[in-house]
Amino acid sequence: MPEGPEIRRAADNLEAAIKGKPLTDVWFAFAQLKPYESQLTGQIVTRIETRGKALLTHFSNGLTLYSHNQLYGVWRVIDTGEIPKTTRILRVRLQTADKTILLYSASDIEMLTAEQLTTHPFLQRVGPDVLDARLTPEEVKARLLSPRFRNRQFSGLLLDQAFLAGLGNYLRVEILWQVGLTGQHKAKDLNEAQLNALSHALLDIPRLSYTTRGQADENKHHGALFRFKVFHRDGEACERCGGIIEKTTLSSRPFYWCPHCQK
């Protein structure tokens, strides 16, 4: 599943295609969304926001399209009039004079009013987004030490969108390697230096992934600045200590680590 940097990059591409342009045609696959087709035609997309792995497409009439790609959903940008070659099932089409964005295969799609945005179950449950520039390491540290999260092992905590939105497995692996910790640790057991290092890494690594490339290719490195240090590198030498990177399973997900320098 794509993680926060990939979702934000996808949103950037969608915004670049249609933001600020009048919608010339709107189509939804689901019956409950059909009434909104006429309401949105002629409106403009004002911005596309990410909340972790969910996308919020905001329209000029105050409505917001909520979509969560889950495992199979994917957005695409095409030239208007182009017929894409795909076997995927189309769910949403937002068309302007020159560009069209398409959502395929997703099933978690809703139209929300401004009031409904504040009460939506997923949006209420999800934590602060790691790519939100307003989120600081100090706030992350306070969240780590809060009664809700301080007793949680990092193996599960760093996958929990209620803790920090946008984290996922490759980010979990790389963050813990960066700070030299294993997934069995809990925030309550860390010293001040470890807490500070982890609080910064929880923001720095996702943001570096987003700004340098932001696309998940699990068999290749991430751009020139951010590259995988341990993810999918089992059997290779750790660049920090020379130990051999190992692969195991934590919280039902593949986990890569260096037993020599992650303690």
Swiss-Prot record:
Cofactor note as given: Binds 1 zinc ion per subunit.
Q: Keyword Transmembrane: yes or no?
A: no
Question: What is the catalytic activity of this protein?
Answer: 2'-deoxyribonucleotide-(2'-deoxyribose 5'-phosphate)-2'-deoxyribonucleotide-DNA = a 3'-end 2'-deoxyribonucleotide-(2,3-dehydro-2,3-deoxyribose 5'-phosphate)-DNA + a 5'-end 5'-phospho-2'-deoxyribonucleoside-DNA + H(+)
EC number(s) recorded for this UniProt protein: 3.2.2.-, 4.2.99.18
| Segments forming FPG-type zinc fingers | 229-263
Taxonomy, superkingdom:
Bacteria
Q: Give the protein's function.
A: Involved in base excision repair of DNA damaged by oxidation or by mutagenic agents. Acts as a DNA glycosylase that recognizes and removes damaged bases. Has a preference for oxidized pyrimidines, such as thymine glycol, 5,6-dihydrouracil and 5,6-dihydrothymine. Has AP (apurinic/apyrimidinic) lyase activity and introduces nicks in the DNA strand. Cleaves the DNA backbone by beta-delta elimination to generate a single-strand break at the site of the removed base with both 3'- and 5'-phosphates.
Family, according to the entry, reads as follows:
Belongs to the FPG family.
Q: Which HAMAP family match?
A: Endonuclease_8
User: What name does this protein carry?
Assistant: Endonuclease 8
Q: Which organism is it from?
A: Salmonella agona (strain SL483)
Cite the source lineage. Answer: Bacteria, Pseudomonadati, Pseudomonadota, Gammaproteobacteria, Enterobacterales
Q: Which gene encodes it?
A: nei
